[in-house]
Amino acid sequence: IRDARGWRFLPDVPDPVNGFTFLSEAYAASNPDFGGRVTVPVLWDTHHHRIVNNESADLIRMLNSEFDALDGVDTSFDLYPPALREEIDALNARVYDDVNNGVYKTGFATTQEAYEESFDRLFATLGELEARLDTSRYLVGHAVTEADWRLFTTLVRFDPVYVGHFKCNEVRIADLPNLSNYLRDLYQRPGI
């Protein structure tokens, strides 16, 4: 949870590896001279005691395949199948710019013009995704891919956070039947 002191581990959900109270301690342990912004998510290397990566786009790909050789890793699915990579990459770029980052561009716009531009792009893209899901259960292909999970992170917060706080309020996800059902389907997956 993030408070005035930064990202902190809750007492009832402590850091089980290092006992850190704040995520900034992980950044300092990785690089004592670190002076940048502490961000999440973070992948921590327990052997070398350092942050390996903190970029969500990289992490989803790393977690998809980098550990496949380890015993006990379920390799029965691939979130980034070779035959769909070009389409996934194109959709990820659009979703990131217009939706994932679009809610922030809208919410933190400093001019009316910037607000309207990002607002219009956000809801145009949501409309296109709603139409896309009218003929397909998933965004790309016939199984869940990284494109679905990258959109999920914004959709799951959209109605409770972005509609009111960021003024992304043309329509709620709950009012878009395909996106709403899609979000519900992803949310009900084991481990979510």
Q: Model-derived features: where do they sit?
A:
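C-terminal alpha-helical interaction module
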Residues: 1-192
